[in-house]
From Swiss-Prot:
The active site is at C290 (phosphocysteine intermediate). It is an enzyme of class 3 (hydrolase). Its EC number is 3.1.3.16, 3.1.3.48. This is Dual specificity protein phosphatase 9. CDD domains: DSP_DUSP9 (cd14644).
Length: 384
């Protein structure tokens, strides 16, 4: 990191007009970012799954930044900061004394940005020092903090990482899921090596007893459906037919969502979860499928596991990954699962507070960041 640090004075000058536009990335936790931040900074929202991809080189850091993912690095610098500016090494000058753990978000991003040609630096002393020296250049989402000179900022805070990731500008189902099925092997969970294409199972994959994950081909295979006792079929596409809808032996539900970064799949989570529950309560098999069985159907299945088994996003994703190694939800769907995870935690906290006779905090409903389009708002949770 030697020579890559920039002082608070340098940043103050860069933020003063008419300086070139500076991209500020806040590498702290979402909670700290929402509480207070440097004016104009974007929060880096990287779950462990995407951070692992970034470290392994499976994901380009360019895809995380605003703008088209294939655009060249901008001439303006990128400045990253954390809370304290790194760790001090004894006996060294402050300007050369800051370092980060190899696994940290800031250290990983700084290294990858430099490797990809960005003018990337870190802020010496981090947010704590800058806030102390330049409080007028900081802002907060909390309205009217007594004694604070930081400006409150209404509305959702901007986030970098998942919302800006896009698989294509106007991709069809065949150009997204099907292509990603063949290109995404080995990009997700550590230690998972997908089998050769010719050796992949031809039947749907069992995730839980009676819960199956599959593709369009699986949904059209009457023999395998009968063999597995599947009577309920959740079709997560806008245009694939329900092949046996006229057959009274099957119950269908269709979620008309394309595999595209602009789609809000999370608003269908409650009814999808209810449909799966109905099938399992009847001791019937249920198939959740999309086109290739790697993105939309995986997202719905992971959401179901998170709510019904009280799993974290990482644990639910890894459970599905162990069963089906080639899964690859598009990045905005991953962001919606992150929001869903936060909502589940808030719901559980609210239930605990009610059970203990307390009252839920009035600030317990922060905005969701990835439920696009934004007019759809946040989703309500189905009862567990």
């Amino acid at each position: 990191m030697e020579g890559l640090g920039r002082s608070c004075l340098w940043l103050r000058r860069e933020l003063s007009p008419p300086r070139p536009r500076l991209l500020l990335l806040d590498c702290r936790s979402r909670e700290l970012y929402e509480s207070a931040r440097i004016g104009g900074a974007l929060s880096v929202a990287l779950p462990a799954l995407l951070l692992r991809r970034l470290r392994r080189g499976s994901l380009s850091v360019r895809a995380l930044l605003p703008g088209p993912p294939l655009q060249p690095p901008p001439p303006a610098p990128v400045l990253l900061y954390d809370q304290g500016g790194g760790r001090r090494r004894r006996g060294e000058a402050e300007a050369e004394a800051e370092e980060w753990e190899a696994e940290s978000v800031l250290g990983t991003l700084l290294q990858k940005l430099r490797e990809e040609g960005y003018l990337a630096y870190y802020l010496q002393g981090g947010f704590s020092r800058f806030q102390a020296e330049c409080p007028h250049l900081c802002e907060t989402s909390l309205a009217g903090r007594a004694g604070s000179s930081m400006a409150p900022v209404p509305g959702p805070v901007p986030v970098v990482g998942l919302g800006s990731l896009c698989l294509g500008s106007d991709c069809s189902d065949a150009e997204s899921e099907a292509d990603r099925d063949s290109m995404s092997c080995g990009l997700d969970s550590e230690g998972a090596t997908p089998p050769p294409v010719g050796l992949r199972a031809s039947f749907p994959v069992q995730i839980l007893p009676n819960l199956y994950l599959g593709s369009a081909r699986d949904s059209a295979n009457l023999e395998s459906l009968a063999k597995l006792g599947i009577r309920y079929i959740l079709n997560v596409t806008p245009n694939l037919p329900n092949f046996f809808e006229k057959n009274g032996d099957f119950h269908y539900k269709q979620i008309p969502i394309s595999d595209h970064w602009s789609q809000n799949l999370s608003r269908f989570f409650p009814e999808a979860i209810e449909f799966i529950d109905e099938a399992l309560s009847q001791n019937c098999g249920v198939l959740v499928h999309c086109l290739a069985g790697v993105s939309r159907s995986v997202t719905v299945t992971v959401a179901y596991l998170m709510q019904k088994l009280h799993l974290s996003l990482n644990d639910a994703y890894d459970l599905v990954k162990r069963k089906k190694s080639n899964i690859s939800p598009n990045f905005n769907f991953m962001g919606q699962l992150l929001d869903f995870e936060r909502s589940l935690r808030l719901e559980e906290r609210h239930s605990q507070e009610q059970g203990s006779g307390g009252q839920a905090s009035a600030a317990s409903n922060p905005p969701s960041f990835f439920t696009t389009p934004t007019s759809d708002g946040a989703f309500e949770l189905a009862p567990t």
